[in-house]
Each structure stands twice: as structure tokens, then as C-alpha cells.
């Protein structure tokens, strides 16, 4: 697994306010844990720790809604 911003299918981050929201999202996707990273590179976004390799992560480039 890897530590990364979990991404939606359009390469967009999951915006957040609460750590609990991200921890639920990350663990549901197989990560060990997750939290809401405040004021990071992509604003307030969910960061997952030890996320499985088959789960999409935010990569450089545009986010397409």
C-alpha cells in the first residue's frame, strides 16, 4: 500500500472537514487509516495511509468533474 490522497474517478480529491469522514472513506477502501489534511496541496483533502495499490490516488494534472 501507499500513503496518498485518495482520488475520485476524475482525479479529484475528496474534500473534507472531519478526520472521521476520511478515516471511514480510507478504511472502506482498504487503507490502514486516514485523516483530513488541512490546507494541503489540494486544499482540505482526505489523505490515506497504507492504501492498496488498486485504489486510485490523486496524480499530477487536472481534476475533471
UniProtKB/Swiss-Prot annotation:
Q: Which SMART domains match?
A: Knot1
Using the record's annotation, list all stretches that form the LCN-type CS-alpha/beta domain. Answer: 2-64
Q: Name one GO biological process term.
A: defense response
Listed Pfam families: Toxin_3 (PF00537)
Give UniProt keywords alphabetically. Disulfide bond, Ion channel impairing toxin, Neurotoxin, Secreted, Toxin, Voltage-gated sodium channel impairing toxin
Query: Single GO cellular component annotation?
Result: extracellular region
Name of the protein in question: Alpha-like toxin Bom4
Organism per entry: Buthus occitanus mardochei (Moroccan scorpion)
Amino acid at each position: 500500500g501507499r500513503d496518498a490522497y485518495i482520488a475520485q474517478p476524475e482525479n479529484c480529491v475528496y474534500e473534507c472537514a472531519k478526520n472521521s469522514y476520511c478515516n471511514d472513506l480510507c478504511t472502506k477502501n482498504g487503507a490502514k487509516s486516514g485523516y483530513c489534511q488541512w490546507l494541503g496541496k489540494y486544499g482540505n483533502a482526505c489523505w490515506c495511509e497504507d492504501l492498496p495499490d488498486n485504489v486510485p490516488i490523486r496524480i499530477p494534472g487536472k481534476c475533471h468533474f
